[in-house]
Amino acid sequence: MHRLLLESHGGGNETSGSGGGDGYTRDMNFDANMVIILAALLCALILALGLNSILRCAMRCGFGLSSSAAAGTVADRAGLKKRELKKFPVAEYGSGEVKIAATECAICLGEFADGERVRVLPPCNHSFHMSCIDTWLVSHSSCPNCRHSLIEVHVAGSE
């Protein structure tokens, strides 16, 4: 039916081999090529989304981590117990018994006052107000400044 309309629109003075059917064939080829291209793009999109989902699931489940690294990240999320907190040294700011390089607590951003009790973390020597760092270490097991794990220090120091 479509071909009849095309031939009648042309006026009928064209010969059958001169191109009356060529435009129709060209349109059909263009439509078929467009469908193939769109189908290939859709398949590529679905494949990419599937691979992304698989990778995210694998990372979430921890397949990308070794067993020791996975244990370390779980331990870093857990805090320290109160009796472990008491093992960290406490110094009096300004007394000169322990050299404290910092002048302010990195947690509350308050300056240390002379005579104030400051807790010094052994592996990195960062200093904090006792109340600030104790609150932090109840829910974390790393230094808030440098993220150095404090669990390794206790394991090595307790033996």
Swiss-Prot record:
First and last residues of each zinc finger (RING-type): 105-147
A Gene Ontology cellular-component term: membrane
One of the record's GO molecular function terms: transferase activity
Compartments where found: Membrane
Keyword rRNA-binding among UniProt keywords: no
PROSITE patterns: ZF_RING_2
Recorded domain comment: The RING-type zinc finger domain mediates binding to an E2 ubiquitin-conjugating enzyme.
PANTHER family linked to this entry: RING-H2 FINGER PROTEIN ATL78, RING-TYPE E3 UBIQUITIN TRANSFERASE
Pathway membership, UniProt: Protein modification; protein ubiquitination
Superkingdom to which the source organism belongs: Eukaryota
Keywords on record: Membrane, Metal-binding, Transferase, Transmembrane, Transmembrane helix, Ubl conjugation pathway, Zinc, Zinc-finger
Gene it is expressed from: ATL74
The protein's name: RING-H2 finger protein ATL74
EC category name: transferase
EC number: 2.3.2.27
Biological process annotations from GO: protein ubiquitination
